[in-house]
Amino acid sequence: MRVRIIAVGKAKDRDLRSLLGDYYARIERYAKLEEIELKDGKADEVAERLARSIPDRSRVVALEVDGRAIGSRDFAKWLGRAENESVQTVVFLIGGAYGLPQELSKKADLRLSLSAMTLPHRLARLFLAEQIYRAFSILRGEPYDH
């Protein structure tokens, strides 16, 4: 399975890149990981760039402040179902300062909220990476999540 994280905006901060790199390396033990950073801009241009970055027959997760709040174990079950159903790519969409275009969010298989609080998109990317790693470790029965 492939995991593709598509984020509007760049994570330039060296410390953030280091933390992301650590979690991305951990995720790579379980799935091929790809991160795509898209330039922010006009809403219609962002929507088009995002849509072009989503492979056909992907399972799409839109990170939304008003999305569904689920725990780590339920998220692991969701990801496990995608694996069991031989989904080729699970795509995670992270919007910029103004969120995701509505038309893409509505088409997502899961609208996911990482927190009841609004997170900066760069921090949301780090939280997401940790939760993806945690989900895979739960699915494999590894001791990371206790």
Q: Model-derived features: where do they sit?
A:
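Post-transcriptional modification and biogenesis factors for structured RNAs
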Residues: 1-146
